[in-house]
Amino acid sequence: MCDDEVAALVVDNGSGMCKAGFAGDDAPRAVFPSIVGRPRHQGVMVGMGQKDSYVGDEAQSKRGILTLKYPIEHGIVTNWDDMEKIWHHTFYNELRVAPEEHPVLLTEAPLNPKANREKMTQIMFETFNAPAMYVAIQAVLSLYASGRTTGIVLDSGDGVTHTVPIYEGYALPHAILRLDLAGRDLTDYLMKILTERGYSFTTTAEREIVRDIKEKLCYVALDFENEMATAASSSSLEKSYELPDGQVITIGNERFRCPESLFQPSFLGMESAGIHETTYNSIMKCDVDIRKDLYANTVLSGGTTMFPGIADRMQKEITALAPSTMKIKIIAPPERKYSVWIGGSILASLSTFQQMWISKQEYDESGPSIVHRKCF
């Protein structure tokens, strides 16, 4: 790695979207759905040069004839054959690079099982022949992207939400909390409450439409009860949305009822604490001396934190839970949808990081377990 010309590759594999690009860039070059599709019926499309699998956007666009699978569930890789296909697609089709010529920085979910990071390491070195690689925890990268080394990150994506307290660059594993409530659940809930309004969304194709409605029209209310009253008494909160077939639907209190379930998981029939309480519980599991730093550096990250109004609501809810004299600051960077990737891009291009890479040589000498010694 003495040659500075070679840019490292940064790949953030999320449950919903894969973000990939080159270290030193300020945004990922490729963002595509983390899905692998296989034809439902063998040989239906004779002579069409049918492939046995499709990845990402191509799988999405052909979803009518495919069975779609997400190899990453709740942030953790569960299907390695499909994961390998996603990485192959990332390197060869999206970035158009030879992975054996670039160091690769991968990201992992907090509390990722040890066997998983070993498997990632093994695939990078043995299947893709990477010269060097590193595995970084997603939330830690988001914190770096915000220019901090101490703080608590609320990272909420498509498949899972975590609260991760970080002190001087190290995640504190005993205080990390996981909440299996994220973007995909909100989309499902919006499908359900729109059905109650008389609009039917059931297929996977229609689910994508609902996801778009969620991303474009939903917001978090500062005071849920007040907002419900406003919605009931006037049409000021109503918005219309045009479906692909030209039909126009109107959406009212669903706009804020959907993301409200982040704060009240009981809406989804879940008996867990909301994101505000989970953040607070996570802080309370930390040493009393660092709590002040965590309250003052609460960083939001991931696509599910993109709802307008979420930062103000978090501020209000955490202020209500915390000691009255505590200074609370919620940091919601505008680029937080990609902050894990951006943090990876920053880390992999630091001169001080270059000695941290696991080289192919070290891997050959020690095997996959090297990852636990070099990446923590």
From Swiss-Prot:
Residues 1-2 form a propeptide. It catalyses: ATP + H2O = ADP + phosphate + H(+). It comes from the Eukaryota. It is an enzyme of class 3 (hydrolase). Its EC number is 3.6.4.-. InterPro entries: Actin, Actin/actin-like_CS, Actin_CS, ATPase_NBD. The modification N-acetylaspartate is found at D3. Keywords: Acetylation, ATP-binding, Cytoplasm, Cytoskeleton, Hydrolase, Muscle protein, Nucleotide-binding. Its main location: cytoplasm. Belongs to the actin family. There are at least 12 actin genes in P.magellanicus. Only one actin gene is expressed in the adductor muscle. This is Actin, adductor muscle.
